Amino acid sequence: MQAALLRLASTEELLAPDENGVRLPAGFHSRIVVRSGQILFNYQWHAAPDGGAIFATEDAGWIYVSNSELDHNAGGVGALRFDHSGKLIDAYSILNNTNRNCAGGHTPWQTWLSCEEIAKGRVWECDPFGKKEGQVRAALGLFRHEAVAVDTINKQIYLTEDETDGCLYRY
């Protein structure tokens, strides 16, 4: 895995688009895992996918979480669970009834912070394993959130604001 990431980070020339329209370096391939509206494991994958992250599982698999940037309380966060071989084994929601969930951030304590990109938008802390309901983190403010990053060394949280004259906030 480390070698593949190092190759991906190199400055290799990208090849012509593959069958999925993705340009990749030599030795890499793409696959479409899911499309918006597709039903997987009794869960309909959301429209307007946006910010996401990967979380390791105890059995060497992983969970991919993805925000849904829809308005009118139709936004939220979906999760795809993969086994150690990369086979998709589950799909489920970890947050519903929110608005324009844009980017967010992976926390060191293994949760996903999903940011609403609306006036008076909130930050929701979500459990990627789907065992706990999402919680509003009111202390992170009400504004048009974009993304969040956690600095564990200096014990700081950084938030960006999605405005033309937006700010970078440090907590």
Task: Show which residues each predicted segment covers.
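Sequence/structural signature of beta-propeller domains
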Residues: 1-171
